[in-house]
Amino acid sequence: MTLKSSEGEGGNSMRTALSDLYLEHLLQKRNRPETSLNQSNVTTEDMYTNGSPAPGSPAHAKGQEARRVRLIQFEKITEEPMGITLKLNEKQSCTVARILHGGMIHRQGSLHVGDEILEINGTNVTNHSVDQLQKAMKETKGMISLKVIANQQSRLPALQMFMRAQFDYDPQKDNLIPCKEAGLKFVTGDIIQIINKDDSNWWQGRVEGSSKESAGLIPSPELQEWRVASVAHSAPSEAPSCSPFGKKKKCKDKYLAKHSSIFDQLDVVSYEEVVRLPAFKRKTLVLIGASGVGRSHIKNGLLSHNPEKFAYPAPYTTRPPKKSEEDGKEYHFISTEEMTKNISANEFLEFGSYQGNMFGTKFETVHQIHKQDKIAILDIEPQTLKTVRTAELSPFIVFIAPTDQGTQTEALQQLQKDSEAIRSQYAHYFDLSLVNNSVDETLKKLQEAFDQACSSPQWVPVSWVY
């Protein structure tokens, strides 16, 4: 049930443990009874055109084709939308294009995608536009009668798939959506249950935990990635920036070069498939934030208040040790040649240089903390998030934002600007965001949130399990 991992035995063992946990969770859910759809106030009656016989009759058995027409009647007594969209097929017949999960029609189970509608309340739909028919369906109240030819190929099982949104979406601001009222609004980090993805451009989903039971339309990953790439293509070119927090320069040539898969993964985000696991312990606490936001104070506070729970992996450096420094305590001192060799062997999760000396944190140092049954604290650059967000490290990622109180000095404004640049580019990785108005207050909220995460069911990337 597990896939190969390039992180070594530690990564494989952690992935296996999470896979076993997920399998146990699925087995516990297997015997739960399913709820049936509400079909009250709906009547159906089979009819046959041109005197064609019913299926099973001798004439039908000889291969004569029968166009089976169903008369569907139901009462619409509220302003609730019917949750249905129509289209004209290649024969210019009116067919059901989409049924929103949880909507009125879906709950009744009276229509299915692909069904052909012949009449609405006795009126033949021929020579009517889709907009006219949609309006008629929307404005009709009381008893509604439909004559329908069923599409027998549309009876597909319900989809069970969950995705974490990696962008904010408001259907009212989307000019591409076929029906704004049918759209689903969500924000980065929302868990969306995917109900239907038959349409390559518009999936149906609902936000997990929302009071709204009916599904809404959301852009498919392909459509969203095309949209972002199109915006990048049309954006004016910018001068390259060396700042890690500067606005990322979109390279249209790279994207046009046959949609490089690596470029897509790095620059275009839409959704991430996730699974829900029972409570398990996160092994790493990652602090993300702009320089000067107070991550070091928070890290030191956690280490001093809970030395038995948290530990910080001592970085490796090529600079000479000071007289008061002990090798392996605050730093591991190493030669430039050896560090370069270790970097080539992918032993560092993060490395860089400062004032001519190299610094870096090794995976091995983090693993040693885990073996002591402690939680490793990492205060890394946001570019490293892709590297650490694995089942092997099982991180809980916290974004520290600058204070929103006090005098707006020039330094604070710059800090807020840098923080917003990080948030806008990496927010889809964050498990928690905290405003650091007070170190003590931030420490309290962080520890409470971390403990809550480790003791509650959690949504994790599907790659952590399979």
UniProtKB/Swiss-Prot annotation:
GO BP annotations, alphabetical order: regulation of neutrophil chemotaxis
Intracellular or extracellular location(s): Cell membrane; Cell projection, Stereocilium
PROSITE patterns to which the protein is assigned, alphabetical: GUANYLATE_KINASE_1 (PS00856), GUANYLATE_KINASE_2 (PS50052), PDZ (PS50106), SH3 (PS50002)
Residue(s) carrying Phosphoserine: S13, S19, S52, S57, S110, S243
Protein's membrane topology: Lipid-anchor
Positions of the UniProt region annotated as Interaction with PALS1: 268-466
Stretches for region Disordered: 29-65
Keywords linked to the UniProt accession: Acetylation, Cell membrane, Cell projection, Lipoprotein, Membrane, Palmitate, Phosphoprotein, SH3 domain
Annotated GO CC locations: centriolar satellite; cortical cytoskeleton; membrane; plasma membrane; stereocilium
Recorded phenotype for the gene knockout or disruption: Neutrophils form multiple transient pseudopods upon chemotactic stimulation, and do not migrate efficiently in vitro.
Main subcellular location of this protein, as a coarse class: membrane
N-acetylthreonine modified-residue sites: T2
Compositionally biased region (Polar residues): 34-52
Chain ranges of the Guanylate kinase-like domain: 282-451
The UniProt record lists the keyword rRNA processing: no
Residue ranges annotated for the SH3 domain, each copy included: 158-228
SUPFAM superfamilies (alphabetical): P-loop containing nucleoside triphosphate hydrolases, PDZ domain-like, SH3-domain
Subunit structure comment from the entry: Heterodimer with PALS1. Interacts with DLG5 and NF2. Interacts (via guanylate kinase-like domain) with WHRN (via third PDZ domain).
Family (UniProt): Belongs to the MAGUK family.
Role description: Essential regulator of neutrophil polarity. Regulates neutrophil polarization by regulating AKT1 phosphorylation through a mechanism that is independent of PIK3CG activity.
Entry protein name: 55 kDa erythrocyte membrane protein
Organism this protein belongs to: Mus musculus (Mouse)
Gene that encodes it: Mpp1
